[in-house]
Swiss-Prot record:
Residue numbers on the Mitochondrial matrix membrane side: 154-187, 280-324, 457-487
Mitochondrial intermembrane side: 1-132, 209-258, 346-435, 509-527
Family of this protein: Belongs to the mitochondrial carrier (TC 2.A.29) family.
The protein's name in its UniProt record: Mitochondrial substrate carrier family protein V
Length: 527
């Protein structure tokens, strides 16, 4: 109640009670009303205060709620982080468990591998050792047979190579057949095999080590290469594939790899068997003519070793080793490379012949098929592609050739079957002939290229025997002195009997090696 209302009510009360107006009562009424007004104002103030307090409380509640929401969000984030951390820990634990499992599995596998590896290693070692033994034995047998078959030409070659070192040439051997007859006349029929015992003792391990080293290098290159066709492969220009060595192999070596393998084979075999070669040559020379180099000094292989060691020391057993390595390493390198190349060409020719003969003998056509095939041939430039993989023979051929109408009408399956049916015949008979022919060609090429180095090797090996003068300081000095004293022709003395010796020797050696290797591998497979 405000003052205006109060005045109005006061006026009305005075008017109504004008007859009974009492100032004291009016004053009391005014005071009570004023007190009421004050009370009302205080109540209003309290209400306002309460409202403000409520508003403040609502704000506090809202702020608290916001804080709680923030806390909840933070808790949610923390929970999510904890979940992520737990997931990470779980994944890490899983990874660690997998690693531990893998390690345990590896340990188990290693344990098994040790058993397997011991079984595999035992098997692989056994197989490797069996293979190595097979290579070694096959090469040794091949060397012994091939050198025994050509022992007379071997001895005659050595005599003619070194007889120019003597001042007395009146009793020297000249020619090939005539010299062989003269040798038999002078020394008897057994003279053909004089020194052959030492020759076999030297050549047999030499040949075995040579083939073993070559196969080892070949396996190393095959295991560490992708075997992609190379432009430098030995049959480049034929079919673009790699070198194939021997029946049953699937070699794809390049020419440098093949030559390197051959060089390592020659180096290893020469170093380990060189003293035997020195003994062999000295035994072959003695008694051949009346010069000092041919005098009888040695009574067999054992006596030769001890006498050379006693008279000349260990150096005597390795005299001319540098020159020998310089001549034998390229010799063996070229020999293997040419053999591999000729073998691929030979088998390719045989297969081409079989393909053409099979197609001509098994195909018949009609006039309509001829016309249709003529159209097809025009589209294909009158050519067809025949692909055949003969793993047993190590051949991978892609032959593209023009063919007749009859051959072009033959189904490819019939052509493949007809060739496959002849595969056994190829493996049985033709393989040996192919190996023999390729070995002979390889021997002829190698002999022509490397013969001068062989002359140097032999002369360096025998100089100084029996107190004779040492003529040459080294291989280069020997080359200059031979050219100045005897001429270029001296480097080819004895090459005719050498051809008679080397060509069949290399041919027999490769052919016998392949046969023995196949027989040995078949026995191991059966076991």
């Amino acid at each position: 109640m405000n003052s205006s209302d109060f005045k109005k009510s006061f006026k009305e009360s005075t008017e109504n009670n004008s007859n009974t107006y009492r100032p004291s009562k009016t004053l009391n009424t005014y005071k009570s009303l004023k007190n009421g007004n004050n009370i009302a104002n205080s109540l209003i103030i309290q209400l306002n205060n309460n409202v403000n307090n409520n508003l403040n409380k609502e704000k506090l509640i809202k702020s608290n709620n916001n804080k709680l929401l923030n806390l909840n969000n933070n808790n949610k984030n923390n929970n999510n982080n904890n979940i992520n951390n737990n997931n990470n820990l779980i994944s890490k634990n899983g990874i660690l468990n997998n690693i531990i499992k893998n390690e345990n599995q590896n340990k188990i596998l290693k344990g098994n591998n040790k058993n397997n590896s011991n079984s595999k290693l035992d098997v692989s070692k056994k197989s490797i050792s069996k293979e190595n033994v097979n290579y070694l034995v096959s090469g040794s047998i091949a060397g012994a047979i091939s050198r025994s078959a050509t022992a007379g030409f071997e001895r005659l070659t050595i005599i003619q190579q070194v007889q120019g070192m003597s001042q007395n040439l009146s009793q020297g051997y000249v020619g090939c057949i005539a010299a062989m007859k003269e040798m038999v006349k002078r020394e008897g029929f057994k003279s053909i095999w004089k020194g052959n015992g030492a020759n076999i003792v030297k050549v047999s391990p030499n040949s075995g080590i040579r083939f073993l080293t070559y196969e080892f290098c070949k396996k190393h290159f095959l295991d560490n290469s992708s075997n992609h066709p190379s432009s430098s492969s030995i049959e480049n220009g034929i079919d673009g594939n790699g070198v194939g060595c021997g029946s049953g192999s699937e070699m794809k070596m390049t020419v440098p790899q093949t030559m390197f393998s051959g060089a390592m084979a020659g180096l290893t075999s020469t170093f380990f068997t060189y003293p035997l070669d020195v003994v062999r040559i000295r035994l072959s020379l003695q008694g051949s003519c009346s010069n000092d180099y041919a005098a009888h000094r040695y009574n067999g292989i054992t006596h030769s070793f001890f006498k050379i060691h006693k008279d000349e020391g260990v150096k005597g057993l390795y005299k001319g080793l540098g020159t020998s390595i310089a001549s034998i390493v390229p010799w063996v390198s070229i020999s293997f490379a040419t053999y591999e190349g000729f073998k691929i060409i030979c088998k390719k020719m045989i297969l081409n012949y079989q393909i053409s003969s099979s197609s001509l003998s098994t195909t018949t056509t009609t006039p309509s098929s001829i016309n249709n095939n003529n159209n097809n041939n025009n589209k294909n430039n009158n050519s067809f592609i025949y692909e055949n993989e003969l793993g047993e023979n190590g051949i991978n051929l892609t032959n593209t050739s023009g063919c007749s109408t009859m051959a072009s009408t033959m189904p490819s399956s019939l052509l493949i079957n007809s060739v496959a049916s002849d595969e056994n015949e190829l493996k049985k008979g033709v393989n040996m002939i192919c190996d023999f022919v390729c070995g002979a060609l390889s021997g002829a090429v190698t002999m022509t290229v490397c013969y001068p180095l062989d002359v140097l090797r032999r002369r360096m090996m025998i100089q100084g025997i029996g107190g004779n003068k040492v003529l040459y300081k080294n291989g280069w000095d020997a080359t200059k002195k031979i050219l100045s004293n005897e001429g270029l022709v001296a480097f080819y003395h004895g090459i005719i009997p050498a051809y008679f010796k080397v060509v069949p020797t290399v041919a027999i050696s490769f052919a016998v090696y392949e046969i023995c290797k196949d027989l040995g591998s078949n026995k191991y497979q059966q076991k």
